[in-house]
Each structure stands twice: as structure tokens, then as C-alpha cells.
């Protein structure tokens, strides 16, 4: 009787399976997440402060780390974050750590301001069975609205018309 009354609530907190093939239950998921998020925040320091990637990673990692520190229960962590199971969050955190290493290696923010990229144009004909996904013409209402905005702002922006070849393409 005692075990039924006390044991059941304790057993309810133990996750038996993730329900995702190949994704095993992590019994100490909270501790693993806290460790991974802390490592992520240390690793991202190598990325320049003004980079959007660093700002985004720091922002969501800090938020997730705070939730993990505030909540003891894995169910509450999953509920508050709303990003899947804790095991999925662990995989995401590991992937983010790997990506940070790659980003530091690739150094995409180290491109000089005067760098010019070579544009390669391919004039080969496109086979008929390949869709070209060209957007259709803009509706007349778009041009009316644009002209109204230009008239209101009273700037010297030339009015756009449907006959402009740049706007039709």
C-alpha cells in the first residue's frame, strides 16, 4: 500500500522512451543541457560581438540555460521551452556547438569590405520540363498604393509604373 501511494508519483517522472526511433532517454538531461549551454556560451565568445549569429546564439542559449536552472523537472523544461523533448534539445545543443566550431573555422565575418564576388552567368537553355518559378506581374493596386505613398511623402522618388521593365520581371 505504501509503495503504491508514494512510488507511483515518483515513477511517473521517469521517462520510459522518447517515442523517437534512435533517440534514447537521457536520465540526467537537465544536467547535460546546463553543461552544453554553458559550453556554448563560452565557445561563442570567439565570434565577434557585433555579428548577428553570435547575438542570436547567445540570446536563445541564455534563455534556455535560465529555464534549465530554474526548473528541476524535465517535463517543466520541455513545457516552458516548447521546443520538443529534452533529448531533442540535447541534440540541438550538440549540433550548435559543432556549428560554432565550423563558423569559427570558416570565418564568414572576416570578408574584407572591398571583396568582390565573381558572378558566373549560365546562358544554357532551361529544359521545358524544369519549372522556372518566375513571379507573375504585380497587381495594379500595388502601383496605386505605391504612387499614393510617394505623393504623401513628397520626395523625389520617381513614380513606378507597370510599364517599367524592372518591375515586371
Swiss-Prot record:
Keywords: Electron transport, Membrane, Mitochondrion, Mitochondrion inner membrane, Respiratory chain, Transit peptide, Transport. GO terms for biological process: photorespiration; respiratory electron transport chain. One of its GO terms (cellular component) is plastid. InterPro entries: NDUFA5. It is a peripheral membrane protein. It is found in: Mitochondrion inner membrane. Residues 1-11 form a transit peptide. Belongs to the complex I NDUFA5 subunit family. This is Probable NADH dehydrogenase [ubiquinone] 1 alpha subcomplex subunit 5, mitochondrial.
